[in-house]
């Protein structure tokens, strides 16, 4: 089950909701409810974030400014399997504007240790523009992290995540990756 937190965005979102871990507003769509996706997109503000539910080598996220293009891309992802089986289910998510960073937490399922944070550079273009790649690089330490922000991350995200893993008997030992927006 712990692997599903990484392998399925829908499972991860449900986990976050169960443990009151902050996450963007979202809804999941498949070929069975794709007709309802248009109404959800209309109430969202652009840009529209479409995420393949499964693993897609870091390339399964589309950020689209135009409503019609978002509708078309969603259908391409689900019906045409743009990202293979990974996009048979797509999470439409509220766009969060800010700086993306990565948190790595070592855990034995009961205790944890946070490793240094890193600032990701995923985009193919100069100045972090263009499509996502499988990973262009990351820089650590992150200069904009202060003790107040680190405390919020620990109290609102890390502790509830480790608590949830333990409470749901996931028996996980290893690294928990947490992607954040500041």
Residue ranges and their predicted role:
Residues 39-40, 73:
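CheY-like receiver
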Residues 40-41, 53, 81-82:
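Short secondary-structure boundary/capping segments
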Residues 61-182:
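Internal nucleotide-binding/catalytic subdomain
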Residues 12-17, 43-44, 67-69, 109:
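Short, hinge-like loop/turn segments at secondary-structure boundaries
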Residues 1-39, 47-49, 55:
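Conserved N-proximal alpha/beta basic substrate-recognition cap immediately N-terminal to
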């Amino acid at each position: 089950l712990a692997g599903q937190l990484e392998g399925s965005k829908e499972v991860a979102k449900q986990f976050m909701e169960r443990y009151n871990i902050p996450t963007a507003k979202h809804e999941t769509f498949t070929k069975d409810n794709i007709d309802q996706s248009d109404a959800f997109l209309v109430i969202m503000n652009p840009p529209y974030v479409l995420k393949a539910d499964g693993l897609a080598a870091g390339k399964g996220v589309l950020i689209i400014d135009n409503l019609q293009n978002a509708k078309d891309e969603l259908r391409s992802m689900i019906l045409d399997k743009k990202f293979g089986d990974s996009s048979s289910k797509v999470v439409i998510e509220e766009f969060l504007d800010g700086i993306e960073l990565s948190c790595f937490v070592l855990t034995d399922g009961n205790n944890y240790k946070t490793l240094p944070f890193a600032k990701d550079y995923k985009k193919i273009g100069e100045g972090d523009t263009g499509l996502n790649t499988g990973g262009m690089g990351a820089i650590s330490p992150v200069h904009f992290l202060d003790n107040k922000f680190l405390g919020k991350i620990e109290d609102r995200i890390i502790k509830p995540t480790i608590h949830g893993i333990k409470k749901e008997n996931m028996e996980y030992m290893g690294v928990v990756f947490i992607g954040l927006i500041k």
